[in-house]
C-alpha cells in the first residue's frame, strides 16, 4: 500500500494544488507480534495527533488497529481514509454495543473508508453458500475485531437464508495446529466451514488441518474473507488451499475500470511487482486525500479542520473503483464485492456480487 500512496503523490509532483506534500509511512506491526500491534497503533496515532503539520491520515490496514486509532485521531480532528478496514462497527451499528459512537468522543465523524463494509461482505458469504447448495455451516473466527465481527455478520445472514449454523467458536490462533478443532468439526459433517480472520492468525494451518481431518474442499467447502485474500494464503496453504472460496469487499484487478487497469500496468512497470488486492484501494484513498487538501487550499488555509471537511465532501468521485461518494457515516457508496476461488495455486475471479441488490 505504501508504494501506491507514494505513486499517487509522485504523479502530482509531490503537490496537492500549490501545497507541498510530505508523506511518512507508519508500520502498525511489530516484529514481536508478527502482525499489527495495539500498542504500536496507539503510538502511531498519538504521534500524529501531536504533530500539527500532519493534516491527513491514510489508513490503517487492520480494523482492530482502527478501533484504537480512530478515537485518538478524532479528538485531534484528523481526517482518516482507510483503504482496507471493513469492520461494520467503525461506522454504523451492527457490531458491539455503543458502536460506532464510542469511537467518536467529539461527537463528530473523522473516519472514512473506500471499501465495502462487512455487513455486506457477510451477506455475500452467505449468498455464496446458498448458491453452492450449502445447507449447514460451521463458523470459526480468530477472536479479533475484524474476524469475529465478520463471522457474526455471516452467521446472521446464514440464519436469514435458512442455512443451519451447526457450530460457532473462536480459535486459539497461538496454537501450533487446529487438529482437534477440525476433527471435532469432521464429526459434525457440515457442508461448509467459514473462517472469519486474517492470514497472520494461521488461516493456512486451518485449511491444512481441515484436509488432514479428511475434509477436502470438494466435499466440505472452505470459505474465507478478504483477510486471507493474500498470496501468503496460497504459499502457506499449498494443496490444502485448493478449491477454497474467498470473498473480497471490492473488486480484483481484473475487474477494475479502464482507469484501474491502466493503473495496474503502470504500477507493475514502475515497481516490477504485482499489485495486491488493496493496492488500488490505497491509491484511490491517497488521491481522495490529495484532492481534499487541494480543495481546502483553494478555499483558504489548509488545516485539519478544512481537510476533514473536504474529505467528507467527496462526491461523485471518478476514480479507479468507479464513480462513488462518501456517505454521512464515512462509508463508500460503492456496493460491489467479488468472489474468488483458489485454482492451481492462484486466486481466480468467479463473480461480482452487488450488495445493493441483495
Regions flagged by a language model, labelled:
Residues 25-38, 44, 116, 167-177:
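Short beta->alpha junction loops
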Residues 269-279, 290-347:
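Segments of small-molecule ligand-sensing domains
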Residues 63-74, 176, 190-214:
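Hydrophobic alpha-helical
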Residues 207-283, 297, 347-349, 353-358:
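Extracellular/periplasmic periplasmic-binding protein-like sensory domains
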Residues 17-25, 56-61, 138-142, 196, ...:
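Surface-exposed patches in mature extracellular/periplasmic domains of secreted proteins
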Residues 34-55, 127, 177-189:
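Short, well-structured alpha-helical segments in soluble
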Residues 51-168, 221-243:
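Extracytoplasmic ligand/sensor domains, especially the bilobed periplasmic-binding protein
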Residues 2-28, 159-163:
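Signal peptide-proximal N-terminal region
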Amino acid at each position: 500500500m505504501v508504494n501506491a500512496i507514494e505513486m499517487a503523490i509522485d504523479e502530482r509532483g509531490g503537490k496537492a494544488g500549490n501545497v507541498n506534500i510530505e508523506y511518512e509511512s507508519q508500520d502498525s506491526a511489530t516484529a514481536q507480534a508478527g502482525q499489527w500491534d495495539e500498542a504500536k497503533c496507539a503510538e502511531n496515532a498519538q504521534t500524529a495527533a501531536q504533530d500539527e503539520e500532519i493534516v491527513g491520515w491514510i489508513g490503517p490496514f487492520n480494523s482492530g488497529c482502527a478501533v484504537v486509532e480512530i478515537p485518538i485521531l478524532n479528538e485531534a480532528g484528523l481526517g482518516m481514509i482507510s483503504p482496507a478496514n471493513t469492520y461494520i462497527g467503525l461506522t454504523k451499528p451492527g457490531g458491539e454495543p455503543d458502536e460506532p459512537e464510542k469511537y467518536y468522543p467529539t461527537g463528530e465523524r473523522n473516519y472514512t473508508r473506500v471499501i465495502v463494509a462487512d455487513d455486506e461482505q457477510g451477506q455475500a458469504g452467505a449468498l455464496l453458500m446458498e448458491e453452492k447448495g450449502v445447507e449447514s455451516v460451521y463458523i470459526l473466527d480468530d477472536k479479533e475485531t475484524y474476524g469475529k465481527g465478520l463471522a457474526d455478520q455471516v452467521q446472521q445472514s446464514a440464519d436469514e437464508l435458512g442455512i443451519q449454523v451447526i457450530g460457532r467458536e473462536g480459535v486459539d490462533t497461538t496454537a501450533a495446529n487446529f487438529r482437534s478443532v477440525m476433527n471435532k468439526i469432521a464429526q459434525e459433517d457440515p457442508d461448509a466451514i467459514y473462517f472469519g480472520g486474517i492470514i497472520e492468525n494461521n488461516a493456512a494451518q486451518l485449511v491444512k488441518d481441515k484436509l488432514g481431518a479428511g475434509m477436502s474442499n470438494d466435499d466440505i467447502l472452505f470459505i474465507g474473507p478478504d483477510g486471507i485474500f493474500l498470496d501468503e494464503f496460497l504459499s502457506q496453504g499449498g494443496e490444502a488451499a485448493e478449491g477454497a472460496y474467498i470473498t473480497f469487499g471490492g473488486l480484483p484487478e481484473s475487474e477494475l475500470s479502464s482507469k484501474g487497469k491502466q493503473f495496474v500496468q503502470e504500477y507493475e512497470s514502475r515497481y516490477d511487482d504485482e499489485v495486491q488486492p488493496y493496492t488500488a484501494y490505497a491509491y484511490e484513498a491517497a488521491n481522495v486525500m490529495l484532492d481534499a487538501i487541494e480543495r481546502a487550499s483553494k478555499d483558504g488555509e489548509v488545516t485539519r479542520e478544512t481537510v476533514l471537511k473536504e474529505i467528507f465532501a467527496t462526491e461523485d468521485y471518478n476514480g479507479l473503483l468507479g464513480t462513488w461518494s462518501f456517505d454521512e457515516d464515512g462509508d463508500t457508496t460503492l456496493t460491489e464485492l467479488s468472489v474468488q476461488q483458489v485454482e492451481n495455486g492462484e486466486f481466480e475471479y468467479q463473480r461480482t456480487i452487488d450488495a445493493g441488490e441483495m
